[in-house]
């Protein structure tokens, strides 16, 4: 697919805006490499149900409406490994691959609490009441992260607040 290096994001051709990254507006490059994928498309209905029937999960409404529209476009399966460079966390079943940056970054919310090996802190603090995130990473925190948690049958954060930018 198409890849935006500054955003560390993969896009389909139809998601591009004038051939550029829809998030930052920069040029994208065609990426072709061996990779593992997470079946994100499997969770589209569950995510739509979450957004539409639990509106407090994602606020403000403008962010929730953006994510509903994004999911309704059709979710592509998510590339979760890279094989064209060697920095990063190795994939345990194939050391020629490293984890996609957002996969390990999002999982840090629970692995930093000791999940799954030392669950005391995880059980005390998860699920969190609120994730406060910038608008440019709402998609990762309200589509990819919940789908990852759903696949592991773990509870979701109770709410995600996607704030705008403060410009001074």
Residue ranges, per PLM feature:
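Cys/His-rich Zn2+-binding cysteine-cluster or related metal-binding knuckle/ribbon modules and their
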Residues: 1-16
């Amino acid at each position: 697919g198409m890849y935006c290096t500054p955003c560390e994001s993969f896009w389909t051709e139809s998601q591009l805006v004038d051939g550029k990254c829809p998030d930052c507006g920069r040029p994208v490059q065609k990426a072709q490499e061996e990779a593992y994928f997470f079946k994100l498309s499997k969770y589209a209905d569950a995510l739509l149900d979450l957004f539409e029937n639990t509106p407090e999960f994602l606020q403000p409404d403008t962010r929730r409406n953006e994510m509903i529209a994004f999911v309704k476009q059709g979710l592509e399966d998510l590339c979760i490994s890279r094989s064209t460079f060697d920095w990063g966390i190795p994939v345990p079943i194939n050391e020629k691959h490293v984890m996609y940056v957002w996969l390990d970054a999002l999982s840090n919310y629970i692995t930093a609490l000791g999940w799954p090996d030392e669950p005391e802190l995880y059980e005390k603090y998860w699920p969190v009441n609120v994730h406060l995130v910038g608008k440019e990473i709402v998609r990762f925190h309200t589509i990819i992260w919940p789908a990852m948690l759903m696949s592991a049958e773990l509870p979701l954060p109770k709410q995600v607040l996607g704030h705008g930018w403060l410009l001074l």
